[in-house]
């Protein structure tokens, strides 16, 4: 049972893998390995932005604001998350980008967990963002 349990701290563990705490990119055998879902604890300084839009999205995503002010850009629409617990969900085929209006912490859940979506090096998010 010990091998199928992992106890950690999202902030500390996220810092080790550019925010990602669960998904296909964790080692097989690690309870945090999953091809079904991926989870990110994103800590973003004020004015942090995704370096380029994600296009041809194959996943569904949920982004929940933990703290701060965070804007998600979607085709033809901008969504501003301002209160703790505000969230946005977008489905497959919806391109997106984001911008931290203030220092922000967001929790992102995406499914399924698939490789790809690399952003330019300037991006402080994980390549799977």
Segments (PLM) and residue ranges:
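Short histidine-centered beta-strand/loop micro-motifs
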Residues: 29-31, 50-57, 74, 80-81, ...
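Short, conserved beta-strand element in jelly-roll/cupin
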Residues: 55-72
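Structural motif
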Residues: 69, 95, 103-105
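Short acidic-glycine-tyrosine-enriched beta hairpin
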Residues: 76-93
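Double-stranded beta-helix
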Residues: 3-6, 99-129
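Conserved hydrophobic/aromatic positions in well-ordered beta-strands
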Residues: 40-42, 63, 107
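Short, surface-exposed beta-edge/turn micro-motifs
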Residues: 59-62, 85, 103-104
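A short, N-terminal "cap"/entry segment at the start of jelly-roll beta-barrel domains
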Residues: 1-46, 50-53, 122-129
């Amino acid at each position: 049972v010990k091998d199928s349990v992992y106890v950690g701290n999202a902030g500390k563990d996220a810092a080790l893998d550019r925010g990602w705490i669960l998904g296909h990119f964790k080692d097989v055998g690690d309870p945090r390995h999953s091809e079904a879902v991926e989870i990110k604890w994103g800590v973003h300084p004020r004015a942090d932005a995704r370096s380029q839009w994600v296009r041809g999205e194959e996943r569904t995503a949920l982004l929940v604001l933990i703290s701060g002010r965070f804007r998600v850009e979607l085709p033809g629409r901008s969504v501003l998350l301002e209160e703790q617990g505000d969230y946005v969900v977008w489905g497959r085929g919806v391109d997106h980008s984001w911008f931290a209006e203030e220092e922000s912490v967001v929790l992102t859940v995406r499914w399924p967990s698939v490789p790809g979506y690399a952003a330019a090096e300037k991006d402080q998010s994980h390549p799977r963002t």
